[in-house]
From Swiss-Prot:
One of its GO terms (biological process) is translation. The keyword Ribonucleoprotein applies. One of its GO terms (molecular function) is structural constituent of ribosome. Keywords: Ribonucleoprotein, Ribosomal protein. InterPro entries: Ribosomal_bS16, Ribosomal_bS16_CS, Ribosomal_bS16_dom_sf. GO terms for cellular component: cytoplasm; small ribosomal subunit. This is Small ribosomal subunit protein bS16. It holds the Pfam family Ribosomal_S16. Belongs to the bacterial ribosomal protein bS16 family. It comes from Koribacter versatilis (strain Ellin345).
Amino acid sequence: MLMIRLSRRGARKQPHYRIVVIEKDRARDGRSVEVVGTYNPRTNPGSIELKRERVEYWVSKGAQMSDRVKKLWDKTPAAPASVA
């Protein structure tokens, strides 16, 4: 089963996270299928970058979001629809 969750990067006491698609039973920082975003909690407010279309793709394929990623997903504004 695939999960969309955080993978920790950065130095000690300076966390920076990648938002990754990964097998559920792999280690937190193990080999991921795809990196779909980043999260830096050290900025005020925390900076979040997400590839929304890729996250939606993986969710449509059955990937589950972790609780924290779900909260970050809700915080990020949806891209405005292009006016044709």
